[in-house]
Amino acid sequence: MNTPHQIQYEAFAAARGLYDERHAKLYAEFAEDLIADGSFSIVYEGVAHACYTPLTIDKALHLKCFVLAPLAVLPEFQRKGYATRLMEEAEKQLDADVIFVMGEPFHYGNRYNTPHKVLPPVKTQAPLECWFARELSPGALDGIGESTSSVTGPYAAPLMWGHPSEQV
């Protein structure tokens, strides 16, 4: 059985493009830090891993929210639906109202497409068009309007909210 560290490291080490071995090490260690801090961690069929960290919407303290990151699938299993099935299973287990993710539109735009005005919990140069939400409780974000949000623990580090080119 692959560990979260192994899955994160191998996936990002093989990703190329924006990522290199330094990112692989950073994200694998980040996942370990999140797990040690109590974030929800899920390994799906030994080939995919993700962490979900509690997030507070400052104008909606009653909502149970999480932010997803990091998510990785071993290279030989990518583009075969493992990430989607992992997210579906995590959503069942978390019983959340809303899940947020900061990421590329081509990865997350279809699944995380709930309109919202919740700001990321950490100041980032990333465009707000890359800050996605998925309501799991229909209407959970209705009437919230613009709001700040917050996280604690390892994901509160500004480095992890930066563009990959800024992280290493």
Mark where each language-model region is.
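A conserved beta-turn-beta hairpin within the catalytic core of GNAT-like acetyltransferases
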Residues: 56-68, 78
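Short acidic (Asp/Glu) patches
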Residues: 52-53, 86, 90, 114-118
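C-terminal "cap" of GNAT-fold acetyltransferases
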Residues: 123-167
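Conserved active-site alpha-helix within GNAT-family acetyltransferase domains
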Residues: 99-128
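Conserved acetyl-CoA-binding loop-helix of GNAT-fold acetyltransferases
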Residues: 68, 73, 79-92, 101
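Active-site rim helix/loop that mediates acceptor-substrate recognition in acyltransferases
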Residues: 8, 12-43, 49-56
